[in-house]
Amino acid sequence: MAQAKLIDGKAFAADLRAKIAEEVAALKAEHGVTPGLAVVLVGEDPASQVYVRNKGEQTTAAGMYSETHRLPETTTQDELLAVVAKLNADPKIHGVLVQFPVPPHISQMDVVAALSPDKDVDGLTVTNAGRLASGLPALAPCTPTGCMMLIRDAIGDLKGKTAVVIGRSNLMGKPMAQMLLAADCTVTIAHSRSQDLPSIVRQADIVVAAVGRAEMVKADWVKPGAVVIDVGITRFPARDPEAAAAGKTRLVGDVAFDEVREVAGAITPVPGGVGPMTIACLLANTLTAAKRLSGIA
């Protein structure tokens, strides 16, 4: 059997960002509206700092207005919620994103509850989650939205396909399952405590791995020809000892890529698969929010 088709999330995301930039330019020219995204980061988490910097750069590159609020690790919950309230009320901001994780003394649930659902571009509020589950228009979480685009591009019509989502988080697993269900797939949500996980996964035409366990999904778990979407990211020291000593890392997904690509029909790499789609879909959500808040959409 031939190796799996490589799903190039980087190229797909670049095309999506170009389309968004065109729409942003048209929105400015026709309505005088510039979509604005504010990202709030609490603390010094290195991975979060990279994500936040990338979000800011890509927001600006798409022609949008970008704000980044960097708060110290010692910021209290009340101080953070005050920043969120200010951004909720700011007319030039259409999307508000608090970068998670936040320090342990701050409740992530309380932060999400404080976000205006109209500006909740991560799709985490109860309002947006409920709308998504009910099949109503919603600002949906960015990573599963990006995954759906890649799956549709790889397969086309999803009706009647069997899908297994490994992972049950509010940010990824649950909304991913809702989206696949809305596309008329038969969906199973599995997780690290599911019994006989390999046999569950082996039934699937579509596998979405989002559990955060490096290379957990092996070749003998995967049905020949299946589409495999790897959302997991685990950092390991670089293979080269000198690079590792210098603090360099390598990213590994939830799928044992080298062996699974010999079985699957299509597969996303890590990095370069799902990751670039997440920020592109964040920009798309910000554009949608700007249109809705301006009475255009």
From Swiss-Prot:
Recorded superkingdom: Bacteria
Keyword Oxidoreductase: yes
Residues annotated as signal peptide: none
GO biological process: L-histidine biosynthetic process; methionine biosynthetic process; purine nucleotide biosynthetic process; tetrahydrofolate interconversion
One GO MF term attached to the UniProt entry: methylenetetrahydrofolate dehydrogenase (NADP+) activity
Reactions performed catalytically: (6R)-5,10-methylene-5,6,7,8-tetrahydrofolate + NADP(+) = (6R)-5,10-methenyltetrahydrofolate + NADPH; (6R)-5,10-methenyltetrahydrofolate + H2O = (6R)-10-formyltetrahydrofolate + H(+)
EC nos: 1.5.1.5, 3.5.4.9
GO cellular component terms, semicolon-separated: cytosol
Gene3D superfamilies to which the protein is assigned, alphabetical: Leucine Dehydrogenase, chain A, domain 1, NAD(P)-binding Rossmann-like Domain
Xref: SUPFAM superfamilies: Aminoacid dehydrogenase-like, N-terminal domain, NAD(P)-binding Rossmann-fold domains
Family listed: Belongs to the tetrahydrofolate dehydrogenase/cyclohydrolase family.
PANTHER family xref list: C-1-TETRAHYDROFOLATE SYNTHASE, CYTOPLASMIC (PTHR48099:SF5), C-1-TETRAHYDROFOLATE SYNTHASE, CYTOPLASMIC-RELATED (PTHR48099)
Subunit architecture: Homodimer.
HAMAP family: THF_DHG_CYH (MF_01576)
Function: Catalyzes the oxidation of 5,10-methylenetetrahydrofolate to 5,10-methenyltetrahydrofolate and then the hydrolysis of 5,10-methenyltetrahydrofolate to 10-formyltetrahydrofolate.
NCBIfam families noted in UniProt: PRK14186.1, PRK14188.1
Listed name of the protein: Bifunctional protein FolD
Gene assigned in the entry: folD
